[in-house]
Amino acid sequence: MIARCLLAVRSLRRVGGSRILLRMTLGREVMSPLQAMSSYTVAGRNVLRWDLSPEQIKTRTEELIVQTKQVYDAVGMLGIEEVTYENCLQALADVEVKYIVERTMLDFPQHVSSDKEVRAASTEADKRLSRFDIEMSMRGDIFERIVHLQETCDLGKIKPEARRYLEKSIKMGKRNGLHLPEQVQNEIKSMKKRMSELCIDFNKNLNEDDTFLVFSKAELGALPDDFIDSLEKTDDDKYKITLKYPHYFPVMKKCCIPETRRRMEMAFNTRCKEENTIILQQLLPLRTKVAKLLGYSTHADFVLEMNTAKSTSRVTAFLDDLSQKLKPLGEAEREFILNLKKKECKDRGFEYDGKINAWDLYYYMTQTEELKYSIDQEFLKEYFPIEVVTEGLLNTYQELLGLSFEQMTDAHVWNKSVTLYTVKDKATGEVLGQFYLDLYPREGKYNHAACFGLQPGCLLPDGSRMMAVAALVVNFSQPVAGRPSLLRHDEVRTYFHEFGHVMHQICAQTDFARFSGTNVETDFVEVPSQMLENWVWDVDSLRRLSKHYKDGSPIADDLLEKLVASRLVNTGLLTLRQIVLSKVDQSLHTNTSLDAASEYAKYCSEILGVAATPGTNMPATFGHLAGGYDGQYYGYLWSEVFSMDMFYSCFKKEGIMNPEVGMKYRNLILKPGGSLDGMDMLHNFLKREPNQKAFLMSRGLHAP
């Protein structure tokens, strides 16, 4: 997705918090588990391990639960008049840090381990810990003491971020129903545990899906030889095509055989159809029930309360307004595509059915790009070998944000293809964090693109700072003999986007783990990474990112100009598809009696103008529904309003590699993490309220 990884976020939001300046007030019986946990939280070090066996994962999961619960119990047993900031809130915040770090080692391997048994153990650990998270987040004794603390402590004597932590803790307690009767609390708790398990299973099913189709060479017509040569062959000399991105999208964009594309699209949008449809049928009503018990009309209303949009009515108005503005552009693009199809069917002797099918869309959008801008992505990718792109990307971010990156030798990683880098502030030499790059597909690996926050950059109990650690997990094509991994331009854009999330994780400098990295409002979290996508649409920036893999020659200037100009190609249909997904997400979380497949089909016809293929159920493959974006997928478009405003008003005006603007962005947008509201950060950066002008221009629309 960003695709946003919510591993750390989930732990942070579900476990009320924790930290350890209760040394003066807690007894010796609590100190032992805290000391045991403290070995994992050391200032300036990456303490993560990736060599745990399934048995160790299981054992350490239970140990973590016992150790963390002891701290919560100690806080919960404090006499109400004994409660202080140090022995209550600070204590909870301290143990939260240790919990997150240890949990990462237990639940992250499900997404990246090459060992199926390790992945299974990690998934079970995630389920077990998620249930524990819910138990701890619904401790009435803890909530009572936090409320008492707010009522009695001198808020003027604690730092603003600590006040925010206190206020958020009480807000989350109420959103967990801790102000409601015990019977209702227990009902909510039971449903939340079930919801958590369903979400984990939904995405596990997608990650573990190993479906492939078999085609003859003739059925792969117009696909480049280097792609076909990279495919695994069957005993009868046919080719295996998986549904992973490096296989699926080249076929859908370049294969001239409609039946091949139809079979691929059908298989892609029926992945996990049976099991994930059942999960959605259970998950969506549970979310609604919990929301209603908490006093909200719908689940969408519940989640939006914490976002910058605030209400379903604002989201609906935004999506409907944008859809109407894009309608003429979408109609024109569909007409152009239909004419292309009609001509090609005549030229190739195919039957012309007079409509754009779901399996036609990517193919003819690719042809549109080639015809209107003379852009051949297969030719162009020869200038984007992954080593050159990576070097250019890292240099860009270093120069722009005042950082230096150093690749670590003999690094402890989860797969030999993974690399690890240390990040330092260029001016001071201070170590800010580390990041892993996991770039190639493997069996059982997370099959989209995401940044995973692994270790929070925050203060430790002794006042020192834990360095942030993140992982960029994507699935670019594997290198083959005589040729490195070559990236399409849209993959270069994905690389920049996800690395923007990595920089958010690393550059945030907060006191509390709960506010570290990308722990901002869900409809703001994409702002920093989307803003940095603009660098792959700039001629000078593209020169830094490209070089022919054979002779090192640069991309011709006229081709670069055409590539940049092609940014607006198909923008109507691409944006309308995002609106479709956003509307489906909103609908499913406002009216749970709806059938997901039917709702998707309805919006595809009404908004996109391209019918969904009968028999498919795209929502069953829609990982965002179970990955932390429930009721919030609109955030991709919503946050782009802000990201485009920042780019055009500052970077475009003052120079996209202007280090002063880059440091302003680092200090005002990245560094605060979630310690400030997203809208406050935007106002600090823009010195005004944000507007839609730049966003509409980026979509080829008139900005009033």
Curated annotation (Swiss-Prot):
<keyword id="KW-0378">Hydrolase</keyword>
<comment type="function">
    <text>Hydrolyzes oligopeptides such as neurotensin, bradykinin and dynorphin A. Acts as a regulator of cannabinoid signaling pathway by mediating degradation of hemopressin, an antagonist peptide of the cannabinoid receptor CNR1.</text>
</comment>
<dbReference type="InterPro" id="IPR024077">
    <property type="entry name" value="Neurolysin/TOP_dom2"/>
</dbReference>
<dbReference type="InterPro" id="IPR024079">
    <property type="entry name" value="MetalloPept_cat_dom_sf"/>
</dbReference>
<dbReference type="GO" id="GO:0042277">
    <property type="term" value="F:peptide binding"/>
</dbReference>
<feature type="binding site">
    <location>
        <position position="504"/>
    </location>
    <ligand>
        <name>Zn(2+)</name>
    </ligand>
</feature>
<feature type="binding site">
    <location>
        <position position="501"/>
    </location>
    <ligand>
        <name>Zn(2+)</name>
    </ligand>
</feature>
<dbReference type="GO" id="GO:0007186">
    <property type="term" value="P:G protein-coupled receptor signaling pathway"/>
</dbReference>
<keyword id="KW-0809">Transit peptide</keyword>
<dbReference type="GO" id="GO:0004222">
    <property type="term" value="F:metalloendopeptidase activity"/>
</dbReference>
<keyword id="KW-0007">Acetylation</keyword>
<dbReference type="GO" id="GO:0006518">
    <property type="term" value="P:peptide metabolic process"/>
</dbReference>
<dbReference type="Pfam" id="PF01432">
    <property type="entry name" value="Peptidase_M3"/>
</dbReference>
<dbReference type="GO" id="GO:0005886">
    <property type="term" value="C:plasma membrane"/>
</dbReference>
<feature type="binding site">
    <location>
        <position position="497"/>
    </location>
    <ligand>
        <name>Zn(2+)</name>
    </ligand>
</feature>
<dbReference type="InterPro" id="IPR024080">
    <property type="entry name" value="Neurolysin/TOP_N"/>
</dbReference>
<dbReference type="GO" id="GO:0005758">
    <property type="term" value="C:mitochondrial intermembrane space"/>
</dbReference>
<protein>
    <recommendedName>
        <fullName>Neurolysin, mitochondrial</fullName>
        <ecNumber>3.4.24.16</ecNumber>
    </recommendedName>
</protein>
<keyword id="KW-0482">Metalloprotease</keyword>
<dbReference type="GO" id="GO:0006111">
    <property type="term" value="P:regulation of gluconeogenesis"/>
</dbReference>
<dbReference type="GO" id="GO:0005576">
    <property type="term" value="C:extracellular region"/>
</dbReference>
<dbReference type="GO" id="GO:1902809">
    <property type="term" value="P:regulation of skeletal muscle fiber differentiation"/>
</dbReference>
<keyword id="KW-0862">Zinc</keyword>
<dbReference type="GO" id="GO:0046872">
    <property type="term" value="F:metal ion binding"/>
</dbReference>
<feature type="active site">
    <location>
        <position position="498"/>
    </location>
</feature>
<feature type="transit peptide" description="Mitochondrion">
    <location>
        <begin position="1"/>
        <end position="37"/>
    </location>
</feature>
<dbReference type="InterPro" id="IPR045090">
    <property type="entry name" value="Pept_M3A_M3B"/>
</dbReference>
<dbReference type="InterPro" id="IPR001567">
    <property type="entry name" value="Pept_M3A_M3B_dom"/>
</dbReference>
<keyword id="KW-0963">Cytoplasm</keyword>
<dbReference type="GO" id="GO:0005739">
    <property type="term" value="C:mitochondrion"/>
</dbReference>
<keyword id="KW-0645">Protease</keyword>
<dbReference type="GO" id="GO:0005829">
    <property type="term" value="C:cytosol"/>
</dbReference>
<dbReference type="GO" id="GO:0006508">
    <property type="term" value="P:proteolysis"/>
</dbReference>
<feature type="modified residue" description="N6-acetyllysine">
    <location>
        <position position="664"/>
    </location>
</feature>
<keyword id="KW-0479">Metal-binding</keyword>
<keyword id="KW-0496">Mitochondrion</keyword>
<comment type="similarity">
    <text>Belongs to the peptidase M3 family.</text>
</comment>
